Design a protein with these regions (language model features):
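Noncatalytic linker/hinge segments flanking ATPase motor cores
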Residues: 166-171, 301-305, 366-373
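Post-cleavage N-terminal segment of exported redox proteins
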Residues: 2-70, 166, 172-245, 249, ...
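Short glycine/proline-rich, acidic loop/turn segments that cap or connect secondary-structure elements
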Residues: 361-381
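Conserved nucleotide-diphosphate donor binding/catalytic pocket of glycan-assembly enzymes
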Residues: 155-172
Length: 425
């Protein structure tokens, strides 16, 4: 697809978004900023003959690697049926998650073929750049990487996965993706300018260049602005409500909860730049998502092996473990857990509470009215970490949820208001 046509289509999408968010100033401002960037791009692609004549022949249509990556991130031309891009499952307008909830209740993502579904919930791409490369520490704890099982070392390797996954973007091989890239004259020129004239001489080299560009875009501040109420609180720009403050104290307390055992990276609870994950892998006993198994056409007895599906791991002791996700934007990026089994954030907190309270009410899933369900993999559950906190009463559960909502980026705060309005109705 020519770059000017792609920009036109992208521009149409943004105008539609601005209409949708007319009542949400933060999101409308976000869409407006994107509109101006695309308008600039459109002007570049419709420059006069005299302007083109005075430009250097090798001038890149993209100002830098991140700009190229942004174009690639939104390009549906890189999928088999030209219907799916990175942004389809990681939409920047909804917290870089998949906003499509009409299939499998949003637990799994629909592929480019319009029928295939994955087995895991698409994680948010926000703040993903801070995950270290996958490795196993000397103490045997697996850490980092991308995807739920850490199988990609970094963002670039992660970006190379979905285009070739038959149930995602569905392209047969790297060469087919590169051929799609070469349909766009701006890509041809831009890749040469940013990666060298011989970048197109080898399909693997060109494909690798594509993944590096997408990673460069994902490393930008748009994915990790650190401007939530919590961040503003640390800078003295926001005063927490009593409930939010109680939740903050509980979250960082090693006496009353176990939250920060896995969801804290920094050594101080007041350190800026906290990602709210230590990137370790654990099995927390998540039950099977029986309700969605029919949607993915798999037996309800199907077991996801988690970390054991990572080619770098062959020890059964890692079976059923998943990377601890960031809690940044957690309130607006449900459903939750690797299989999307819980729809509501409060349910997640109550699920953790079941390990420290044997009261009947805490052994029941409020979304189903039934017991929580057997864990998908029982033998590797991190009981030591899960059982080290106190039981939470209703007030403390509400407080922790209130605090978690303060981790929402400023641009997504209107989504919280929409959630509240939807629950009220």
């Amino acid at each position: 697809m020519p770059h000017n046509l792609r920009s036109s289509l992208h521009l149409t999408s943004v105008l539609a978004l601005m209409g949708c968010f007319a009542g949400s100033p933060a999101l409308a401002e976000d869409a407006s900023a994107m509109l101006h960037r695309l308008a600039d791009a459109g002007h570049r692609n419709t420059a006069s003959v005299s302007e083109v004549a005075t430009a250097t022949e090798a001038q890149s249509p993209f100002e830098d690697l991140a700009a190229l990556g942004e174009a690639l991130y939104f390009d549906t031309n890189l999928s088999a049926n030209r219907t799916m891009s990175c942004a389809t499952c990681h939409d920047p307008s909804t917290g870089f998650r998949d906003p499509r909830v009409d299939v499998a209740s949003g637990a799994f993502s629909l592929g480019d073929d319009g029928k295939s579904l994955g087995d895991r919930n698409a994680p948010t791409a926000s703040y993903a750049k801070f995950s270290p490369p996958f490795h196993v520490r000397e103490d045997g704890v697996a850490v980092g990487g991308q995807f739920w099982d850490g199988r990609a070392m970094d963002l670039a390797e992660q970006a190379g996965g979905p285009p070739l996954n038959p149930i995602e973007m569905g392209m047969p091989n790297e060469a087919s993706v590169v051929a799609r890239l070469q349909e766009d004259d701006d890509y041809v020129a831009g890749f040469k300018e940013l990666f060298g004239n011989d970048v197109w001489s080898d399909a693997d080299q060109a494909y690798g260049a594509m993944t590096k560009a997408i990673a460069a875009f994902e490393e930008g501040d748009e994915f990790a602005p650190f401007d939530s109420k919590y961040d503003r609180f640390l800078r003295g720009e926001y005063k927490m409500t009593p409930k939010e403050e109680l939740g903050r104290v509980l979250f960082f307390s090693q006496q009353f909860t176990n939250c920060n055992t896995c969801h804290m990276l920094k050594t101080s609870p007041t350190a800026e730049g906290e990602t709210f994950t230590n990137y370790e892998f654990h099995n927390i006993g998540v039950p099977r998502n029986v309700a969605t198994r029919d949607a993915v056409r798999k037996d309800v007895g199907f077991t996801d092996n988690g970390l054991l599906d990572n080619a770098a791991i062959d020890d059964p002791a890692y079976r059923g473990k998943y990377k601890t996700p960031s809690l940044r934007n957690v309130a607006v990026t449900g459903p939750y857990m690797h299989n999307g089994v819980f729809a509501d954030l409060e349910t997640v907190v109550r699920f953790y509470n079941k390990y420290n309270s044997k009261a009947e009410v805490n052994q029941t899933n409020p979304e189903t009215g039934k017991p929580w369900g057997e864990p998908e993999v029982a033998e590797t559950i991190s009981l030591k970490e899960l059982e080290q906190g106190d039981a939470l009463d209703e007030n403390r559960i509400d407080a922790i949820v209130a605090f978690l909502k303060t981790l929402t980026d400023a641009r997504y705060e209107p989504l919280l208001e929409q959630q509240q309005a939807a629950k009220a109705n």
